[in-house]
């Protein structure tokens, strides 16, 4: 076995050992074979790409190796939307008239805050309405949830301190968000699903068509667990997620949608919670990602946090009070910091006024200060420095220099910060391209990909890459990489493993994702166990383990015993994603909530309609007065009172029945007016303003039988 072969811990084994025929250990140096229990594997060759799943294409530049593109799964005659599920704001877009178009939400806005709240009465609020009440309901208002999705508790220590709600761990060390208002703990996927549900409902109204399929974007540097969790969120929301697409890649699709010239572009994506850099070749409908890099712990929230900490420190120095321990004060500080950051994009200084931020025995306390752009940049200087490394890494991985870059595309609201734009100029030597809207371009690109899958867009080929390496835990707690980062997707890699102990029937393998050398520094995607291996001398069984990464960047693992042809069942355990049964339960809960929400909305709409009917009926009775026969009027008034009673205490259906009964009686008013002498036939009756038709002067008009029509002068009878 080659020195790069993986040695894996055996289930119940007592240690690790190299089993290379050259007796090499994992660091490639000679060593003595230790007869301990070990599980080892041998690479079967270079990366194998299943050509049946791809469309072979020639390169644009001529020569070189052939490239592959995934054959899209097309959805016929059904609207597929593109969704940018952001940390701070989200957006949805669709192909309209052959072009990607942003969908406006129910409030008339083009983006929706990624905020969900629960009131004390148990009502759920999503979007702008949830954001508005955050200050008075900080512990039940969930924002920046994207920073927790698909993560373990030990991965979000810093992020959990930046929010006003409680972030707790469950028995599996997964992140849960506590909601005191309804006494429930939510997974991040559930909260994200509620944002997705609103976006899709808004899209359905905008497009006048039910939407059930979507393409959802994620940061390019999201790992497998985070991608899977995002897909689960879509499923909980009742969506079929056709594709998970990287945000910088989506931005490039929107940027290059109508462009024919070949360009090499660098997409600089600094959002609310994550930072990505991707280098792509774009042109002639081909979008090839050359490399990607990033930092999922860096975003606009971190810039806000620096301002919050500065304000809190200054206040504590002056007043001796720690505002960070006050949830309501923390929420006010966070909103003020975000507002100041936005204002400093166009101003050199901004006033920060927070009256009644807290109170002591001496009375209320206020914050009144000025933040300059220079001070803001000083507070965030180390964050700006962290931006450099991913940019340099992405170019190095793409084997390009800055002079090879034609355009630098800025994506994400945080790229509006002048210091960020200046840093991009210094690092790349290019003037950033600001022709795209940084808040909308990702959703527009997702809509283009949705159009490709729906068959609305043709002649576009997308070649994306895996952002992080996939590997296995090997001797000495070392990670041995199997699929390196920036491998074009989809991809497949096989390893042949065998046993290291006589009669061994099962093994356990720890799957990792990351770039660090040691297991402890990388993300564990979970472990899988191979059972049912026929008892045999060590080294005899041949188990082929296949690692597949699909077009969504999501990993799956399968195994086959080459000796018997038997396919082994593999279950991934220990991953920071939700178990299938828990996702199914959340889907059912979401459906139940959707039904409850629909019933509540129906009740509100019915009550509003009933109030309107009562008003219009009372108005008509008053305006027509004595013209209505007494018997008819009594019946209408009786039904009117019944409807009023039902509005106060009846069910939705009872209100609807009472409205129908009242409308039936109101129709008799018109009938009785038609039957009165001089009513003028079927065309007579109450006018829109409630006045009856005049029977005097209008009689000079002859019917519609071809006789002359005489103009009549009308006088106001009042």
Curated annotation (Swiss-Prot):
Disulfide bonds: none annotated. Disruption phenotype: Variegated cotyledons, malformed leaves, growth retardation and impaired root growth. Defective in protein import into chloroplasts during early developmental stages. GO terms for molecular function: ATP binding; ATP-dependent protein folding chaperone; unfolded protein binding. PROSITE patterns: HSP70_1 (PS00297), HSP70_2 (PS00329), HSP70_3 (PS01036). It is found in: Plastid, Chloroplast stroma. Residues 678-693 have a biased composition (Gly residues). GO terms for biological process: protein targeting to chloroplast; protein transport; response to heat. One of its GO terms (cellular component) is cytosol. It comes from the Eukaryota. Residues 706-718 have a biased composition (Acidic residues). The keyword Transit peptide applies. Keywords: ATP-binding, Chaperone, Chloroplast, Host-virus interaction, Nucleotide-binding, Plastid, Protein transport, Stress response, Transit peptide, Transport. CDD domains: ASKHA_NBD_HSP70_DnaK-like (cd10234). Interacts with geminivirus movement protein (MP). Acts redundantly with HSP70-7 in the thermotolerance of germinating seeds. Plays an important role in the protein precursor import into chloroplasts. In cooperation with other chaperones, Hsp70s are key components that facilitate folding of de novo synthesized proteins, assist translocation of precursor proteins into organelles, and are responsible for degradation of damaged protein under stress conditions. This is Heat shock 70 kDa protein 6, chloroplastic. It comes from Arabidopsis thaliana.
